[in-house]
Design a protein with these regions (language model features):
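Juxta-kinase regulatory segment immediately upstream of eukaryotic protein kinase catalytic domains
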Residues: 1-28
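Canonical protein kinase catalytic loop motif
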Residues: 219, 224-225
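ATP-binding glycine-rich phosphate-binding loop
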Residues: 23-45
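A glycine-centered beta->alpha junction motif in the catalytic cores
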Residues: 56-60, 111-126, 147, 171-182, ...
Length: 331
């Protein structure tokens, strides 16, 4: 996120670092990177650097409908990352456990804090062209880590946050949460039928995939260039809050559009598991529907105008207007 959370007391963050991890912070600098989570670069009084990540539990639509459910979902994801790293997958940047062994801790009612080792590396951007070199191998290793599945939630082929889309469809009152509520409502209402058609398409694709008995494996969820750091020792994968058990195409759709694309062929050669074209399409569609659910959740609720909510409104405008990309499936 580009702006720090207005309702998080910086002093509470400092105390949580000290109480939970024994980190006496000498310097904390907000890092305006990524989307969905808030990050700080932390330097302790002994010079050790860490990376603190805070999630607003009221703005994690895909993890749960209330702060407690979102915290449980986030804990399951980070516990899975910890299990993956512990199984020998050195490219997994997992959270540093608290003094009590937890992967993350609550900070007040609405926030969760996780602490990561500071990684010197260069990341790409979300919009960068996908580079499958080394990434397919990492994903194949994650998907083969059967023991870690016990820690993960099971998203399967469902649309995360679907309830927020349905609630918006049923809410005919003027949305009044903040400055982007009414513009968001107008944009959503203009494409209400399109969104309904896309949800129905997701259901049809999901039913077809499940009927074929596609395997479900541990998946990262967002292995795009922005979550891949190139370090002196090679590539590492960060941001594991989206971990879930699902068909492998949940991780592959950004690398391959069809089973014949090079990344899909390489994946099959590594795993012996063929890639399903319907599943690639499903998770490409779920990406936009999941984002739409998150944007609706945030913009219908109380909010202020800032760089992040403006980005979320622009994202909503995009997500409601993607029907044309699916004309071949809908017409």
């Amino acid at each position: 996120m580009r702006t720090p959370p207005a309702d998080l007391d910086p002093g509470a963050l400092v105390r949580a670092l000290a109480d939970g991890w024994g980190i006496a912070a000498d310097r904390i600098d907000y890092a305006p990177v990524g989307a969905g989570s808030h990050h700080w670069r932390v330097v302790a009084d002994d010079g050790v650097r860490t990376f603190a990540t805070v999630d607003h539990l009221g703005q994690k639509a895909w993890l749960g409908d209330d702060p407690d459910a979102a915290f449980a979902g986030l804990r399951a994801a980070l516990d899975t990352a910890t299990a993956l790293a512990g199984s020998g997958l050195g490219f997994v940047v997992a959270p540093r456990p608290s003094a009590g062994g937890a992967s993350l801790l609550r900070v007040g009612e609405l926030f969760a804090l996780a602490v990561y080792p500071f990684v010197d590396g260069r990341s790409g951007d979300f919009d960068d062209a996908p580079d499958g070199e080394g990434v397919v191998e990492m994903l194949a290793a994650v998907h083969g880590a059967e023991n870690a599945a016990a820690h993960a939630s099971a998203e399967g082929v469902s649309v995360p946050g679907r309830s927020h889309i349905l609630a918006a469809m049923q809410d005919e009152r003027p949305w009044s949460g903040g400055p982007f509520s009414r513009p968001a409502q107008r944009a959503f209402e203009a494409h209400r039928g399109d969104v309904a058609d896309l949800l129905a398409l997701a259901d049809r694709l999901a039913a077809a995939i499940e009927a074929r008995g596609r395997p479900h494996v541990v998946t990262h969820g967002e292995p795009h260039p922005g979550n891949i750091l190139t370090t002196a020792g090679g590539k590492v994968l960060v941001d594991w809050d989206t971990v879930s058990v699902a068909p492998p195409e949940r991780d592959l759709w950004g690398l391959a559009r069809t089973p014949g694309d090079p990344a899909a062929v390489a994946y099959t050669e590594l795993t012996g598991r063929p890639v399903d074209g319907d599943a690639l399409d499903l998770f490409r569609l779920i990406w936009d529907l999941k984002d739409l659910a998150e944007y609706l959740h945030v913009l219908r609720a109380p909010h202020t105008e800032n760089e992040d909510t403006e980005r979320e409104f622009r994202g909503l405008e995009h997500c409601v207007s993607v029907r044309g990309e699916w004309a071949g499936r809908l017409d």
